[in-house]
Amino acid sequence: MSYSFTEKKRLRKSFAKRESVQEVPYLLAMQLESYAAFLQADTPADKRTDTGLQAAFSSVFPIVSHSGNARLDFVSYNLGQEPFDVKECQQRGLTYAAPLRVKVRLTIMDKEASKPTVKEVKEQEVYMGELPLMTENGSFVINGTERVIVSQLHRSPGVFFEHDRGKTHSSGKLLFSARIIPYRGSWLDFEFDPKDYLYFRVDRRRKMPVTILLKALGFTPEQILETFYDFDTFHIAKKGVQFELVPERLRGEVAKFDILDKDGKVIVAKDKRITVKHIRDMEKSGISKITVPEEFLLGRSLAAGIVDKTTGEIIANANDEVTESLLDKLREADVNKINTLYANDLDHGDYISQTLRIDEIPDEYSARVAIYRMMRPGEPPTEEAVQALFEGLFFNEDRYDLSAVGRMKFNRRAFPEKIEERTAAWLRRFYEKVGPQGAEGPGTLSNDDILAVIAVLIELRNGRGEIDDIDHLGNRRIRSVGELAENQFRAGLVRVERAVKERLSQAESDNLMPHDLINAKPVSSAIREFFGSSQPSQFMDQTNPLSEITHKRRVSALGPGGLTRERAGFEVRDVHSTHYGRVCPIETPEGPNIGLINSLALYSRTNQYGFLETPYRRVADNKVSDQIDYLSAIEESQYMIAQANSELDQDGRFKEDLVSARYHNEFTMAQPDRVQYMDVAPGQIVSVAASLIPFLEHDDANRALMGANMQRQAVPCLRAEKALVGTGIERTVAVDSGTVVTARRGGVVDYVDSSRIVVRVHDEEAAAGEVGVDIYNLIKYTRSNQNTNINQRPLVNVGDVLARGDVIADGASTDMGELALGQNMLVAFMPWNGYNFEDSILISERVVADDRYTSIHIEELSVVARDTKLGAEEITRDISNLSERMLGRLDESGIIYIGAEVEAGDVLVGKVTPKGETQLTPEEKLLRAIFGEKASDVKDTSLRVPSGMSGTVIDVQVFTREGIERDARAQQIIDDQLADYKQDLADQMRIVEDDAFGRIRRLIEGKVATGGPQKLKKGETVTAEYLDGLARYDWFDIRLSDEDVARQLEQLRDSLSQARIEFDSKFEEKKRKLTQGDELPPGVQKMVKVYLAVKRRIQPGDKMAGRHGNKGVVSKIVPIEDMPHMADGTPMDIVLNPLGVPSRMNIGQILEVHLGWAAKGLGIRIGNMLQAQAKAAELRDFLEQVYNKSNGKSEDIASLSDDEVIDLAKNLRSGVPFATPVFDGATEADIKAMLDLAFPDDDPRTQQLQFASGKTQVTLFDGRTGDAFERPVTVGYMHVLKLHHLVDDKMHARSTGPYSLVTQQPLGGKAQFGGQRFGEMEVWALEAYGASYTLQEMLTVKSDDVTGRTKVYENIVKGEHKIDAGMPESFNVLVKEIRSLAIDIDLDRN
């Protein structure tokens, strides 16, 4: 087992009982793969598959002109080089995008030629706007801010059958319906009404009998009846009627006459119900025809029309009822055989026949007209319009598309693979005629498709078949970034197509080129709108690495084409059994979106159709193999799947006689030999955030939900600290989120400082002729979207050997490459003077003093200088009537220095704006003329620090418009950036040269020369001393006798000069980017951004939380000496209320505290050993005991060298980190074993701590009195987070501020500098106390009495404290409102 560079330094002891069969997949794969499939940027144009952009283009092109003489074909597209990299885009507020160019071919046909001949062909590349690119971490940079496109969970296209659950009709009758949902196009619904007529509707419009649709499709009534019915045959004689007997059809009927066999024996007596036994008897007796009374025939419907053969007169139409008069007519016309429809009330309803009766439309064309009138009411139906509309509804590829998914789902549901025994004969006939349908097929509907849906719906009504469950994940699919972007792109292209069609006719005559035809505006605006302001495109939650990852793995049911919050019921939001392993049942927001926004489970991924699938281990011959299959929710229901915690023996066979398993989405116990699959991991069912909660299995689900959500709000602390009790997935999350820096290639660290790491790559990993250097520029003090601080710190030293993928620098909230959201705090569960009442948290002053929860927040403040009508605004230091103290920290350009500490109200950037001219008196004009311009016509509009903010200036950026001269500060910033870049290139060049000259030395040392510099003679050998005496570039002048070596020397010289040329061009490119003007909004000349770093210590009012949903607000910070302390004098860091645990049922926190206590105890033991300068062997033995002599995963301590063991021990002094994976973690016995190892009974420290029974509770002493508390207290270490709800951001007080326009009352909210609302109930309170003066003041001068409040101000200034209350403005508003209702209301003043 090999450990990475950082793992060696800190091993996590894992309590996992099961070997991991499959690694957790790359967590951002879904986003990256989806967008890569959309762009196909790295695939050559001729090898691209028909997905994404390629599919969008090929679905819209070719575009043919109306006359058909010109057409525009799509050849290929390519994405250019992005002009700026991600970092530059973020700084300049640009979109990180690449230009899209499309090669199109314009073909013009010769109009005059008799047969089609091509007149000319023009091919050209057309620019189609910019396509945003995804950063390597799965986000997009749009206008300088990072955004995420959230995947959408929507109803899969296909056909769905459901019923109304008896809610529509008062009788509670189930009304069945079917709905065909295409990917794009019109919805087609079929539904029964309470009278059992079958209707259809298009796009939820007015309903019409389904037979109208069938007639419009070209079916006659006879064909319709033949499709949906079996026939009964009757032979009509002069006397009596004979019936061809099909015994099966009589089952359950009551015999209306005696049924006799050939010998005249009674099989079924009259008025008896016919049973299965009777049917068997009839089949045995072999009767084929029986004579029946005429009443038996009356009332049945004819299967086909009947024509008098002699006269040609129509006697009866299809579906007519047989009456006595009709029978007489038939006998007259000599008709001796008729077919009637076989129907009964039980399982062969006559719905279609009844529906045909209420439909009075005679033929196909009239049916189409009826549909046209329903779709376009009030428009005159011309023949072309009618046909075009009907064809366009479901049969035109441009208008209607089921998509591959839709077709697959449709065929699976409407055409069953195997026909069941109970299927009716007419349906069996239909399926045999159509034949089996695979998963592929056209995107439009065919007549057979529509018939199949009606047939399945009728069978449902007949009581055969099941309805669909809409919330089943086999019926809901994921639309990821790529697909959403493709839809937007296609929509833009369709708009382009319309315009191009118009212009193509011009192209025939005007000799236009392709780029004259195509206007790319609609495409680029559709894309811009999608990425900039659509619902799926969200401002990335960047509080900490976990919130980034979770945001990218989010799946939302909201958005265009999805649900809305108001309409979504309970069923959609509920956890469904198919969520198992696909969507997390825990992590979802609290509030109106609960259940509509979900998170992907750890191992889940989407298949080619967009359905979520989850991995399972295959079980063959009772043996669990390591072969893994991904199953979607549709496939999963057919298998028996065992849970991951089933006990297995050495060979991978199940130990128990009964295994807990799932079959058909139900949980059951099954025999091992019936099991076909097994879960891959116990944590398979939860999401990333939930899998970070240790002992999740001991927490109530509601609290786990809060815990998962609150981890995403944890603010990165100044010094991150790994959790003592983790779940083992922390490293994966940190690495996959992209916050830490990982080595791209293996190598040796050549140079490290706080902002860059230079690695000399191993020769075997560097490609030939390539620069063997990796330079990692670290992100320093950068603002995240949530104003938290992103800062990377190197973990390596010069000379360290790295492998590919090793973590070499920590980012925000990571510690040695592991996610570290909070701090480990020594916690006691006890009440303390009421300060932890109702979840309040009491913390020690030491926590503040050690800066444990100090976080840095970065605020961006910007100011723009515009060109106004009165003249340009100016950024300057020269501002009148500002004291020198205010201007003291501005440089000569008027911009504050970096490093200045500023308070609210301080000037950051001086700016003046021209004021409007005032009319001058002649005297003033004269003075003006003499003394020149006065400074009074500008007003001070400087950028100041907003109220309630203070901090240190850490960065300033100046952007200047093209063509405007830069000030000294802007020039200096550019010079600094260039110097940094030059340093990078110089380092690269230095290492490349060192490497190259090292190779040259090895190549030519000891070789025979034929001459060279410093009088090297022919035949002399080249020595090391000789080479050292030469300048390195002179080595190339040495002439060697060995031609092969000489050639290699030549090659090295060429590659070196090539590298130098490349570096020079890179530098020039960078210089060009920096010195060209910046793109600024119109009218803006200059923009200055100032970044302030604000240090926030923890203080009362801040919100803190554990990982188990145990949240609270800091109530008091207590001096260290007053905190409860242990017998050895260790004071507590945090005191929590024990009443917060039992009712909330999150016991996980107690177990975490116990295990954390053990972790710290072990750390102290290791620390003591180091202090006593123990030998490496002794440390190794102890580590073996900790890691391998207990339950859980064993670690390979033997593979570490002695130095590595000591290094590891040093890092373990603060506590041995544990991993307790979800559902597979430490048991009570494991925790006790660890506590015994941490606090052995013979250790003096154990005796000193005065443990109660067990080692989880100790006697605590009151810091104020020194007395012991009367009962033992649970203490231990808990990982506690500080959440992004800081009192500094919420605290706010209003002095005189803005007022609302109409009511003249103060505004509300911190952003508006508003006041606190004094509402109706507060007024009642004052009334109840009889505080009349306070009440008057509240309702008048403090609120909306305009004259009164100015009066009060005057009085206070004069020093009189008196109030003259007037008329509140809201009363005037009320009067005006009443007057608007035409009621004249006035105040009578006496």
From Swiss-Prot:
Its EC number is 2.7.7.6. The keyword Transferase applies. Pfam families: RNA_pol_Rpb2_1, RNA_pol_Rpb2_2, RNA_pol_Rpb2_3, RNA_pol_Rpb2_45, RNA_pol_Rpb2_6, RNA_pol_Rpb2_7. One of its GO terms (cellular component) is DNA-directed RNA polymerase complex. GO terms for biological process: DNA-templated transcription. It is an enzyme of class 2 (transferase). GO terms for molecular function: DNA binding; DNA-directed RNA polymerase activity; ribonucleoside binding. InterPro entries: DNA-dir_RNA_pol_bsu_ext_1_sf, DNA-dir_RNA_pol_bsu_external_1, DNA-dir_RNA_pol_su2, DNA-dir_RNAP_su2_dom, DNA-dir_RNAP_su2_hyb_sf, RNA_pol_bsu_bac, RNA_pol_bsu_CS, RNA_pol_bsu_protrusion. It comes from the Bacteria. It catalyses: RNA(n) + a ribonucleoside 5'-triphosphate = RNA(n+1) + diphosphate. PANTHER family: DNA-DIRECTED RNA POLYMERASE I SUBUNIT 2 (PTHR20856). The RNAP catalytic core consists of 2 alpha, 1 beta, 1 beta' and 1 omega subunit. When a sigma factor is associated with the core the holoenzyme is formed, which can initiate transcription. This is DNA-directed RNA polymerase subunit beta. It comes from Methylobacillus flagellatus (strain ATCC 51484 / DSM 6875 / VKM B-1610 / KT). The gene is rpoB.
